[in-house]
């Protein structure tokens, strides 16, 4: 689920994109801002936004909101990645390629980027129909907030494309249920080039994964894992000597 079909992508000019990458918002923070600034905005009452769109967006943000103390299983993490917007274009491509479109269409309605693009389209249409005297700064700010959210998701997508292009680890953002302060876990994934590989069989490939946690009792912890179809090797690195000795 993490990768688009094996096609040769267009090359991204790193020098053009690099200045914009620091402006992207981590997924966990973005979800909180959308819940507050979009779903909680009084502007919604004056815009003719379809109730189903708002309900779909609310459900998606609920899935992407960390639940403190509740550790998601693999199915829930897969759902979070699928709904985060990073694979929106791949789903659109799949929609046009498949003859049975109802399943893919349903997935598109549950995709965060797709929902924000639809909300932006509805908002712009409503703004054009409003008399000029009814336009105010709050409506303009709302429209800009939706645009910035879409831009942030697209910058994360570009970052993933650049990582692949530069042979760097792919980074997946996952809601962090372990820390109320840091709402996003960055999961770094790289195909294992040293293990036995079958280039024609995705199911037989090995991957190296790593993520970092900042825990109140243990300090900073790095979790490394080598994952294959029949093996899982996990190691931990800590910065405190007493924790390592334990």
Q: Across the structure, where does each feature detected by a protein language model lie?
A:
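Extended non-catalytic alpha-helical interaction modules
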Residues: 1-246
């Amino acid at each position: 689920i993490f990768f688009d079909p094996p096609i040769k992508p267009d090359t991204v000019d790193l020098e053009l994109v690099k200045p914009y990458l620091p402006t992207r918002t981590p997924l966990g923070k973005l979800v909180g801002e959308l819940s507050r600034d979009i779903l909680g905005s009084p502007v919604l009452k004056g815009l003719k936004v379809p109730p189903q769109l708002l309900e779909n967006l609310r459900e998606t943000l609920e899935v992407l909101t960390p639940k403190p103390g509740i550790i998601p299983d693999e199915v829930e993490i897969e759902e979070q990645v699928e709904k985060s917007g990073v694979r929106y274009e791949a789903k659109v491509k799949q929609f046009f390629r498949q003859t049975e479109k109802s399943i893919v269409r349903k997935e598109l309605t549950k995709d965060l980027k797709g929902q924000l693009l639809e909300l932006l389209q509805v908002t712009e249409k409503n703004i054009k129909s409003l008399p000029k005297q009814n336009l105010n700064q709050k409506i303009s700010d709302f429209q800009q907030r939706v645009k910035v959210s879409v831009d942030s998701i697209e910058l994360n997508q570009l970052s993933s494309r650049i990582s692949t292009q530069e042979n760097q680890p792919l980074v997946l953002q996952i809601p962090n249920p372990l820390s109320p302060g840091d709402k996003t876990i960055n999961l770094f994934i790289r195909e294992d080039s040293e293990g036995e590989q079958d280039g024609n069989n995705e199911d037989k490939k090995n991957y190296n994964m790593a993520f970092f946690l900042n825990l109140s009792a243990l300090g900073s912890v790095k979790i490394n894992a080598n994952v294959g179809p029949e093996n899982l090797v996990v190691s931990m690195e800590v910065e405190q000597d007493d924790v390592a000795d334990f």
